[in-house]
Structures are given as structure tokens and as C-alpha cells.
């Protein structure tokens, strides 16, 4: 698919300003430490505004009150988002208690936000609390290093509670890959943890002095579940097991969903199969993929800098051969694998080790005490008595993992009393949104605040057409950067302007096909009118077991995207 347009291995030209910033930052230090002490502004200035992203933070402001503050001649109410590094989403109950306390006492919104990259975020950290949050994380063995900007981000791992042996092995690899690809600079420890400056020269043997051209995302996935949505990621290790034991991985490279409205040089892309590798080559191959992208990725245009664009420019076979050369291996042919779904199994599931796992549906991943539903307090109470761990899923849900039979009733009682086990429809369980307003500076339309009532309306349509026990993978993202992974949904809404979305159709349930734009810049009533008609047709005309996305393609409602680099915008 990608050998049609082989281009130069390295793009020559004027480097972006981000490249200058990284080069001049002294390995990500900048003047962040000095800026912390500037009480005249609640934000970070100049390069530091972007450099803090390498330390796991984004500077934001409350957009609901931005205009009001401007009228009062006040600067925006700056506050930081902090994203924890949590490979595979596994967090101990001691760690949970610490983050619960910090969220309640030191953030504007008081919430913990589970993300679809298997970690948690704090929103609304004022500048005075920035250093304390890093120190709190460090005190319980966590950090926020490399969870944003041009590095390998939080490594995902299938949250499969049943296959406990396989999950344990895959999770260990997710941690190893994460550690191996971390930056080596001591800037994080010096700035946030007050560790002494050591008189050695910083080196970044893998990432290099200017780090990666763009963000880089990695997964470890255990078929048949594609809960981590591998095709949204740059580098994916698909677990291959023999007799229940992990023996190696299929490698898929070059997925990614971010686009720009109207810019046909941007596209969502599914990852390409490179081949199979035995376990012992995992870290060498991971490093080789990252360093190839480091050296060949486009540093002259950030909108064309991700791995997916590098693959399309140089060709898949050329990129693959370079990875083989650097890793000193030859890929074996891809081993058979298949995906059957991506949703979480909500409720109790018994593992093969006789322990139980309770998956709790958390709408939009937002953990807060709501009227009559004290979710945050309930989880804190469970954390105080639970001997196992918690696992954040890539669907923004939470698993109480490793519950002995004797503890089940106690934990279920707390969960039910806190509203953590309220019954929801299959449709709601399979819907997701990014944060968007009021905190995200890129948001063009509502997402998290829009989704609950939107799904009420979809539930009504599903009931009207007699398919309430079915679901459609439905996602809303507030802008085309695509954090809500709408570009792998059966029905994807991509924010265009306040109250307006592009409606994409034709993805599939297992997340292996990019949906195509069906209608542009439409309102919620227009979206619902379209879906009313289409859900009605699906209910009447579908074949046995046929998902909504597959139906829209077979019925000729939408043309499938076959080669997104070339036909996404047709």
C-alpha cells in the first residue's frame, strides 16, 4: 500500500521552532525552575510553556470564564493538567489513596480523570501546587516523565483480567519498554525532586538531544481484545502465545488518528504489519523503530512529523528494512491473530487464578462525588480495604483486580452504595469522549460534557428500533487531534465549532478500519436525524451478527476507507 510514493529518507529544510526550543533547552531544563518562582503570573512563559509538556504537564485555562476575565483585565486563570506515567494502567491502592487526597485538596476541579491511555490526569493544578504534585507522585513511586510532547508516551497494555498469566507477562513487557525508552536527562529529578545537579554530561542515547520529531505512542496488546486500539498508535506489540505462555510479538507500526480540518495532507492511518519477533528481541526492535523515526521523521513540519507520515514517505519496506538493520534481526512472517472486540467486560469476571476482577464503568473516566453517586469516595473506601491493585483501562474504566472470593461481597456493597455499579445500557458502555471544554485549549466543540445527554438520545433511538441490547462503538472528540479516538469508531463525531461536528461512519467494532466523513459541520439534531434513519435501516436490513459500521459499508451508505493516505478525503 505504501510503496507507491517513496520519498527522501530525511526531509531537508528549515527546522520548526520546536526543534530550536528542544536544542536550546539544555536537555529539557529551560528556565522552568526560575519560572516556578515568578509569582506575577499563574502560567509558564516563553519556551517553558512547551517544555513543561516533557515533564507531563500542559498549561491550560478555564475557557468558561476566559472572556469574563479578559473583560476584567485579568490574565486567563492558568492551571496545569498533569498526566501520570502508568504503563499498562496498573496502580496500587496506596498510590490511589495518595492521588485521591491530592485531587481533593490541591486541584480546582477536585476530580481524577481516567484517560483512554490507561492513566489518570489531574486538571486544575495551580502553579504553587506544581512542584508538590511531582513530589507527591515520587513519594508513592510514580512520576509524570514523558507523558506528553515528543517522546514515547505512556505504554498501553491490554487490561485482560481473565488471562492472568498472559497479562502478567505482557504487563512486564509494557513496563520494560516504557523504562527502556524513557529520556535519560536528569532535568525532571533536579527541577521537581530537588536532586543535586551532577557534573556529568547529559546524554540521550535513544532519543537524542532534540528528542523525537513528534509524539510517539506504544502498545502491548493481547488478542482477541483490541481494547487499547492499536491502530491509533505508532508502535504495537501484538502478543503471540503458545500453551498460554507468551513467546513473541507481531509488530505493527505507523498507526495514528490526528488530522487537521480541511488539510488533505493529514490523515488517520492504521498500522502496518512488519512481522513476528521472539521475545528476546523486543527491546532492540522497540529502540530501532524509535531511532529510525527519530532520524527520518520530518522536523520541518510538525503536521507531517508522526511515524505514519514517515512510513508513507519512505515506504513501509524501506522503514522495516532499516529497523531490521538497526536491531540486527530479520522479522519472521506475521503469526496468525484476530480481534473480536474492544469493549471492557463490565461487572465481575473470574480469573483463572480463582481471584475475581470487578470492572466498573466510569462514564468519561471522570471520578468525582456526584449528587447521590459518590464515586470518588466509594473508590477511596475500596482502596482502603482492597489487597490487590486497580487497573485503568483504555476505555476509561477501572478494574478492581485480584479480589478473593471472601472479599467480594464487601467490595460489591461499597461499589453499589457509591453508584459505581449502576446499570447502564450497552450503548453507553461502548461510548467515549475526550475532555474538551472547559480545560482543553484545542477544543472546538463539547465532548465530555456533551456525551451523556447525547447517549440518552441514542439510547432512545436504539429502543425505538428494537436494538437496545446492541451497541454501536460511538465516540466524540472535541477537535481533529482525535484524543477521543473517534477516527476508529463505527460512529465518530469530530468537533468543528461550538455545537457542530463532522459525522464519520464506516469504522468497525474491532477498530481496524478508519471511518469516512459522512456529513460535515452539522448540529446535534441533524446528527440524530441521520442516525435515526440509519439505525432503523440497520435494525431491519442487517445480516446475522453484523455490526453497524460493517452494515453502513455493505449497504453502500458509505465507501470504506481502504488506503487512508490516499482515499480518506475522496
Swiss-Prot record:
Its EC number is 1.8.1.2. It comes from the Bacteria. PROSITE patterns: NIR_SIR. Pathway: Sulfur metabolism; hydrogen sulfide biosynthesis; hydrogen sulfide from sulfite (NADPH route): step 1/1. One of its GO terms (molecular function) is 4 iron, 4 sulfur cluster binding. It holds the Pfam family NIR_SIR. It is an enzyme of class 1 (oxidoreductase). InterPro entries: CysI (IPR011786), NiRdtase/SiRdtase_haem-b_fer (IPR005117), Nit/Sulf_reduc_fer-like_dom_sf (IPR036136), NO2/SO3_Rdtase_4Fe4S_dom (IPR006067), NO2/SO3_Rdtase_4Fe4S_prot (IPR045169), NO2/SO3_Rdtase_4Fe4S_sf (IPR045854), NO2/SO3_Rdtase_FeS/sirohaem_BS (IPR006066). [4Fe-4S] cluster binds at residues 434, 440, 479, 483. The keyword RNA-binding does not apply. Binds 1 siroheme per subunit. Siroheme binds at residue 483. Component of the sulfite reductase complex that catalyzes the 6-electron reduction of sulfite to sulfide. This is one of several activities required for the biosynthesis of L-cysteine from sulfate. Alpha(8)-beta(8). The alpha component is a flavoprotein, the beta component is a hemoprotein. This is Sulfite reductase [NADPH] hemoprotein beta-component. It comes from Escherichia coli O157:H7.
